[in-house]
Swiss-Prot record:
This is Mitochondrial genome maintenance protein mgm101. It comes from Schizosaccharomyces pombe (strain 972 / ATCC 24843) (Fission yeast). Performs an essential function in the repair of oxidatively damaged mtDNA that is required for the maintenance of the mitochondrial genome. Binds to DNA. Residues 1-35 form a transit peptide. Belongs to the MGM101 family. One of its GO terms (cellular component) is mitochondrion. It comes from the Eukaryota. It is found in: Mitochondrion matrix, Mitochondrion nucleoid.
Amino acid sequence: MQTMLGKPALQYFGKLSRYLYKNGEPINIWVYSRNSSFSVIPKNGLLSPKITQRFYQNSSIQYQKDKNIYEPKENLEEKELSEGFLDESRLEIPEAGHNWEKSFFGLSSQPFSKEICDLLTAPLEVDDIEIKPDGILYLPEIKYRRILNKAFGPGGWGLAPRGNTNVTSKSVSREYALVCHGRLVSVARGEQTYFDPEGIATASEGCKSNALMRCCKDLGVASELWDPRYIRVFKRENCVEVFVENVLTKKRRKLWRRKEDKFSYPYKEV
């Protein structure tokens, strides 16, 4: 939790973490920065007004009794995450530009040229498609970018943050807008899980990649991967599900792979 709360708050969060349930219901504590929010659920115990009051006084976080949430005071500076992850989404917008956090400029105004459409909706190469061990087909993110670069040209498209980064105890999510040739094309929320607070920055990049994949769906890029019939045919013709054994734990399970690939350490096929 030390990367989520400022040092003044940490001194009292240790006490607060012992107070989870109020009338048998879990208490969800929200800690807000100017542009990011963090959800923290203590481990066990009963919420104490005295503890929450001291927590409020020493962490610069305002407690609202009717909502059981904490919000920052208006006259205080943004809380840092141990001088780490900060979300600076409020950028200055040029006079001639558009604020893509709010603008829908160009959405559905006209279709792109036939040449661009042909590049975006071109069938995928079989060799480009990968499969995860759990059987999910996917296209590597770099290949989405190559398709967009081929269709719009490098610099002719971009992802604009739309809204704030939301960081919970297990995942990061943020909404992005795909802008092509100065027009809003699609809006999607990307999400990415993480297992350690040190990985929040990396998870935020994974969140952006996930949003790009979802935005490309509206342009018809890799649309086959959303078609159940195509997925079944591809897996039947190009993939195989086999039993593998973990050489360290000796546990066996069934995993998917492409027919021409082999599993690497610590797995071996049995």
